[in-house]
Amino acid sequence: MEKRAILVLVCLVVFLPANGGADDEKSWDPALGTATITGTVKFDGKKPRMRPIDMAGADEKCAELHGGARQKPETVVVNDNGTLRNVFVWVKTGVEGWKFPMPEGDALLDQKGCWYLPHVQGMRTGQSLVVRTSDPTAHNVHGFGKVNRPFNRSQPAGAADIAIKMKRDEAGPPMKVKCDIHPWMNSFVAVVDHPYFAVTGSDGSFELPNLPPGTYAIEVWHEKYDTIEQTVTIGDNETKTLEFTYPTKS
């Protein structure tokens, strides 16, 4: 009986360290972050025609915020230089095993002009998504989380901010957030456990700085055109530039 107890104890000593999870992550050393990945997301083809939004048909107050002018949807925004806006870019694989410090503050999603601002954003796992209303009309914020818990909260004009904790990674794809009152209002929030992500803007470019040397899978995501992935190996103090191109789809 004594020999059996000793054998069980030995097995525990041998196998317990191998079953570690997040506790095995190493604290990030900023001195290692010497590499940078930059790039652009291009659009190949004819710009799709976006039907203007009749805000007045849903809410006169929304239309008044824009002087009655019809607004263009944000689904596909092609920049003047032929690049694509509102594309989420992130390091999909390659930084596992590191525990990165959390940023100060939370991520903000503002309802302004009867739009969600920003249209696409990234945030860190463990941060809160703070939803604010800056409009003189009622909204509701409806999050379709597939990994994080879904939510559906109303926000009348002048209401306090709503803070929603994002406890799990959810970047592939990002979580959709919409307003059920104003059907053109939608946003996409990617929740990532590291700081290496970006969103393309008015020139279609992105930058992922302070990476350690290594091999990475870089994924870009667009709400209409889905994902593209490239693998890149980068050395110490090196900068590499990638180019992604989305073809048009019917």
What do the predicted segments below correspond to?
Residues 1-7:
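Bacterial N-terminal signal peptides that target proteins for export
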Residues 21-250:
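Extracytoplasmic copper-binding redox domains, predominantly the cupredoxin/blue-copper superfamily
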Residues 8-15:
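Bacterial N-terminal signal peptides
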